[in-house]
Structures are given as C-alpha cells and as structure tokens.
Swiss-Prot record:
Its EC number is 1.14.-.-. The keyword Lyase does not apply. The lineage of its organism: Eukaryota, Metazoa, Ecdysozoa, Arthropoda, Hexapoda. The gene is Cyp12c1. This is Probable cytochrome P450 12c1, mitochondrial. It is an enzyme of class 1 (oxidoreductase). Keywords: Heme, Iron, Membrane, Metal-binding, Mitochondrion, Monooxygenase, Oxidoreductase, Transit peptide. Belongs to the cytochrome P450 family. Heme binds at C470. It is found in: Mitochondrion membrane. One of its GO terms (molecular function) is iron ion binding. Pfam families: p450. One of its GO terms (cellular component) is mitochondrial membrane. Its main location: mitochondrion. Its cofactor is heme.
Length: 524
C-alpha cells in the first residue's frame, strides 16, 4: 500500500497526487469514494461528556479501573470503534480496536506524524518562564519542529556502531544488578523481596544513564547512592505516576494548577535541573580529556548530541530517562515471569546463551549478540503476552474512513492493540508462552503452525511504526538482551506464586503482584 503525505486533507490534494503517480491516483480515488459513502463523524457511538465524567467519579463504572479494563468496557458497550469526548480542554479521541483501521491510519499519517499522550509534558514545557524548550520540545513535540529534532538525533541513536560502544558499560551495570540480587535475596528461600521492581527500575535507570548522561549514577553499586541520583530517580517515578491522572482521567490542570499537576511540575523542574547539572559535568569531562590529548574515535551519544546543540543534549537526556525506564522495566519483569513459569523455555535459552560464552565471567561481544535468535524470540513473545502499553496514539494525517465512519484530518486516535495480541485467531494458542512462533520455520517443518500466515503486521508494534518509531529501540533491545542473557547464565529463575492478572494498566502496564522471584545460583 502507498504511503501518502496529505497536506490539507485528501480532497485538496487528489489532483496533484493523480498527476504525479497513477497508482496514488487510484488510491486517492478509493479513499474519496469511501468518504462519500461513509457515515458522518457525529454518528460515532460513544458516551456523552456527562456519562464519561460521572463514570470516572466515585461509584461510576470506570472509577478505579485500569485503562485496559476501561477499554474493555468501551469495546463491549460501543463495538470496534467509538468516540470518547474530551473533558476540560482534552481533545475528543476515537478509540479503534480493528487492526485494518490501524494500517490505514499509519499509511496516511504524513511526513510528521502527530502523536498524543504527552500533553502534560508539552503543557509544562510551554509554560516554563525561561522558554528553554522553545523550538526544542524533544521527543514529545510534533510537526516540523519535531521533525527537525528527530532528524538530528536519528543518526546518533539509530546507528549500530553507536549502540555497540555501550556494550561494555551496560555489561558493567548488569554485573552490578546480578550482585545486587545476591545481596537482597533471602539466604534460605533465595527469593528477592516483593518490591523487586524497584531494583529492576534501578537497573534500567542506570542503563539509560550510561547513554543519556554518559555516566553511571550509583543506584546499583552503592549502599548510599549520591543524593542527586536518588532525587532524579524519585522524580522520574513521580512523573510517571502522574500521567494517568493528568493525561487520561478528567483533569482541570490546563486551567488551574491542580495538586497532581503541582507535584508533576515540581518533579519536571528538578529533572531539568539535575539533567542540566549532569550535562554540564559531562562537558567539563570532555573538555578536560581534550586538553589532555585523550581523544577517542568513538564519541559517546552525549558528546555527539552536544556537538549538534547543548539544548538538544539536555532535552534528549531528559526524554530518554522519562521514556526509557518504566517501559523497559515492565518489559524485563514480564520476560522474567514468562521464563520462571516455563522452565523448559528457560533451559533452551540458557543453552543458547552458554554456547556463546567460554566461562561464567566471559563478556558478550557484538558478534555474540547478533547470533542469539532464541533470546530475541523470548523477548518478542513476552512483549506479545505482556505488552508495555495498551496501544499507539496518533492524530489522523488525512481525512480517512475507519469502520465506515468519516474521520477528519487532525482527529485524535488511539489504536488499542493489546487485546488482539491474545486472540487465538491471530496467534494460535495465544495465551501460551511459545517463543518458537517467532523463529524461522524450514520449508519441510510439519510442526504446529504457531502464527497466522495472514497476520497483519500492524497488530504487533511494540516500538511503534514509521517516523515516530521509538528512537531508542536499538539501545532498549541491547539492554533487554544483555539483562536476560546474564540472568539465565547466572541463575535458575522461579516464581512460586499466582500470576493471575499480573499487570495493572494506568498510563503504562505495571506489575500488580509482588515480584518475589527465586534466584538460585547455577553451578558450573
């Protein structure tokens, strides 16, 4: 299918598209024909503003429900598509549960796709009195300004050689994580405390910091970590905890500074101050090395960003920390749960990992990481069963018809794919953890078919799609692969408790059960 860039709606550009490309002409005509025969936007099913507001209050049907449960109710009440009206300055949003509409949205999103979900961050950055973020909203921005910033950071963060230089620093952080597990687990039961998610968060925070700030911060290594590192970590937690109340639930923060927004704003202020301090320290280190003639052919991500623009380096450090800690931690926790509950899969993974290492203390090389297909399959399957978020947000890049309804350009959309990932019609035995479904099959393989051959690729997009694909994907991949590989080569992992409803969904999925994993040292 063709990718269209529509500047002022489909009908405004149809003649231009037809002139340039006959295939584009037929596609535009198809969309125009759909539009003429579609139902008007005003007929979309959905609750009224009052029903929605009342539903989120005490005693309402949505009160205290996770976002995934709210969406289940929407789907049950209204079907595959519905309009959720905006409250208190929030834009109305079309929720769609149909993968065919996902593809149409992505294929017509335009040169600079508009993504929602970060309105509280944008609001804060626009309101700062010093206007630091003017013309530099970072990863949370939209439009031409976002396109300019993204074009600047893509060559830095998406190139393999830049990711490879973090192999050793991340392995060092991983060794600290393994040592930390041995310190905090119970000597008799070998189980870690129920708040083990905090330790995983420390791991991902330190891993991101090695890239974003070009340094370790000491949360895993030191019993009493530096206060500025602890404060930065706590403020990231406050930020993420505020997103649901500010970005999903009805909130007046756009008009008056609510208590939640005040807390959010203070956290953002302190994140900015701390990241600026660390970036300034990095500049001093770089200048000192340069004056001493200590040059390095492989400049760090932070050094490369500083060469582009200091402001961009600070903003990207903030955005990587805000976007790369909770998401990766949730992914790692899900992988561990799946491996703990499927010991035969864990053993197969361990055998693959050990086949690349000469000893327990050997370090992975870049070549090693390229030749671990089962490890990557384990991660893919886990992200299918336990996704990090419930879907992807966009604004319609053109006038389109979704499920028979006219959706005007600019309409906010939420493509909710998390339910589809567990649909047996799409993934046979969908509720089972089967990494093998992601491995290439030989032509003569007669084993069970574990993947629908007609599967639409737009169902499974854990890192997004197109120009707005996660800019840190390669770094996150490396982080997850190293963490899981190091854990299975050091420990046999068990989880001896119920995993019923293991995650709750607010803005992101988070563990809903105590992560009391049992880590038993392996003997070699």
């Amino acid at each position: 299918m063709l990718r269209l860039t529509v500047k002022h709606g489909l009908r405004a550009n149809s003649q231009l598209a037809a002139t340039r490309n006959p295939d584009a002409s037929s596609y535009v005509q198809q969309l125009e024909s759909e539009w003429e025969g579609a139902k008007p936007f005003t007929e979309l099913p959905g609750p009224t503003r009052w029903q929605l507001f009342r539903g989120f209050q005490k005693g309402g049907e949505y009160h205290q429900l996770g976002m995934d449960d709210v969406m289940r109710l929407y789907k049950k009440q209204f079907g595959d598509i519905c309009l959720i009206p905006g409250l208190f300055g929030m834009p109305s949003t079309v929720f769609t549960f149909n993968v065919e509409t996902f593809e149409k949205v992505y294929r017509t999103e335009g040169q600079w796709p508009v993504r929602g979900g970060a309105e509280p961050v944008i609001h804060y950055r626009n309101k700062r009195k010093d206007e630091f973020f003017k013309n530099c909203m970072g990863l949370f921005g939209n439009g031409a300004e976002w396109g300019k910033n993204r074009s600047a950071v893509n060559p830095v963060l998406m190139q393999h050689r830049n990711v490879a230089i973090y192999l050793k620093p991340m392995q060092r952080v991983n060794r600290q994580f393994v040592n930390r597990i041995r310190e905090i687990r119970d000597k008799e039961s070998q189980e870690v405390p129920g708040d083990f998610m905090n330790t995983i968060n420390h791991l991902t925070f330190e891993s991101v910091a090695t890239v974003a700030l070009d340094r370790e911060l000491g949360l895993l290594r030191e019993a009493n970590p530096p206060p500025e590192a602890s404060k930065l970590f706590k403020n990231i937690e406050v930020l993420m905890d505020s997103f649901f109340d500010l970005g999903v639930r009805p909130s007046l923060y756009r008009y008056i500074p609510t208590p939640t927004y005040k807390k959010f704003s203070r956290a953002m202020d302190e994140i900015f101050d701390t990241c600026s301090m660390y970036v300034n320290q990095a500049i001093e280190r770089i200048d000192r090395k340069s004056s001493q003639g200590d040059s390095n052919d492989h400049k760090s991500v932070l050094e490369q960003l500083l060469q582009i623009d200091r402001k961009l380096a600070v903003v990207m450090a903030m955005d990587m920390l805000m976007g790369g800690v909770d998401t990766t931690s949730t992914a790692i926790s899900g992988i561990l749960l799946n491996l703990a509950k499927n010991p035969e899969k864990q053993q197969r993974l361990r055998e693959e990992v050990l086949s690349k290492l000469t000893s327990l203390h050997s370090e992975f090389t870049v070549e090693d990481m390229k030749s671990l297909p089962y490890l990557r399959a384990v991660i893919k399957e886990s992200l299918r069963l336990y996704p990090v978020t419930f879907g992807n947000a966009r604004s319609a890049g053109a006038d389109v018809v979704l499920d028979g309804y006219r959706i005007p350009k600019g309409t906010k959309l939420l493509m909710t794919n998390s339910f589809l990932l567990k649909d047996d019609r799409l993934y046979p035995r969908a509720k089972e953890f089967i990494p093998e479904r992601w491995l290439r099959r030989k032509d003569d393989d007669k084993s069970d078919v574990l993947m629908n051959k007609d599967l639409n690729a737009f169902i499974y997009l854990p890192f997004g799609f197109g120009p707005r694909m996660c800019v840190g994907k390669r770094i996150v991949d490396l982080e997850m692969e190293l963490t899981v590989a190091n854990l299975v080569r050091n420990f046999h992992i068990e989880y001896n408790y119920s995993t019923e409803k293991p995650y709750k969904c607010r803005f992101l999925y988070k563990p809903n059960i105590p992560l009391k994993f049992k880590f038993t040292d392996l003997k070699y």
